[in-house]
């Protein structure tokens, strides 16, 4: 099963409470990603899963994945005539887009399950989100949310915390989620009020004096 790219979680033996705790921490998903995405079979070690050194190595592998060129693997895929990413065929334009989305799915997961996540790694992951926000040449950080997690508020919170919502892209973000739940739209509008409108109000106040 380790060769199955759709493997989502590996559940380790333990009490019901232990299994529930690992699920909340994302340990089972981290273990699955270690072999399906990060391709590090040394991390497939149930005796060390969740320990400090294991988490550190996992995060190092994630950062190494983000550092890879988005066309990495394309030449081999093309020359071998294989299919990648859930059985779909890709050309030189669509391949890097899907590669970034794959990376971003893991980034979002790690930020949502910040078990023993260091500040340095967290800052690096958030900076990666910002490089792919709405309004950039490669806005997949936003596209992943809209296409796959449109109604999941936690994803918008991570997106906002990373600094991906700006005055320049706010109107476009709001347009993209016009058909989303009221909770999502309220979150964005509240963010605008707290971060942008207040600044405008202070600027107007300064002009008065």
Residue map of PLM features:
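Gram-positive cell-envelope targeting signals
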Residues: 1, 61, 69, 74, ...
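Core hydrophobic positions of leucine-rich repeats
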Residues: 1-6, 21-27
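Alpha-helix capping and inter-helical loop/turn segments
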Residues: 4-6, 150-151, 163-168, 179-180
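Concave beta-strand-loop units of leucine-rich repeat
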Residues: 5-6, 11-17
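A conserved mid-domain beta-alpha-beta active-site/ligand-binding segment of alpha/beta enzyme cores
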Residues: 27-83
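Extended compositionally biased segments used for macromolecular assembly or nucleic-acid engagement
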Residues: 77-123
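Ankyrin-repeat boundary/"N-cap" motif
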Residues: 125-148, 160, 168-178, 201-204
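Charge-dense, extended regions
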Residues: 158-163, 172-209
